[in-house]
């Protein structure tokens, strides 16, 4: 039954590939939906520790962010203004505390903003090819880390957060992502004659995804361990929730966007 659930979950996740291929407004629409669902999971998880995030503010910020066409300066003005407003909420309504204000903003930054980097990479020049680095980097890291850990794992990586992860698995994941992302660049360049940037950048992006996607996984695990839950939700049968499946991708997305924006330009 558990295996059947995982297959069902895989079928539910499969359309994401189609949206990646379509790109544009289709991918943006998917990212908005995933952001809202992920933020709901995050806020709901924190309620287990008796936090009371002001959820409506977080959802509003996500919608406003996309309506402003992902304008960073506009959304920062909105975040500062709404934080200013929310800081007054605990004064007039003792149901909320200043910590609730903090986790409300944290949820938007962690889930809403990080999800948006997938869309922001996609709308760059050659973005229809570059966006795959986010997913390939994350998926290969996860797969290579699993098998490397299974074959060679002896030293625990972060036992208090994720007891099953090993240092050897972590290294294997990073190496795997570096190689596969580099090969992806070579295939684009030599196989399809699509030149985007020097090949070494693909290897570097792969290495960075290999490192930071694992941090994304560990951050999500540490939150779950802190609030005492196994999965963020059971939205995807056999796979947990949106944040369970996209935790590493959130960190890869930021890394790929920042590297392309500030290093490659």
What are these regions (language model features)?
Residues 145-146, 221-229:
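Juxtamembrane interface at the ends
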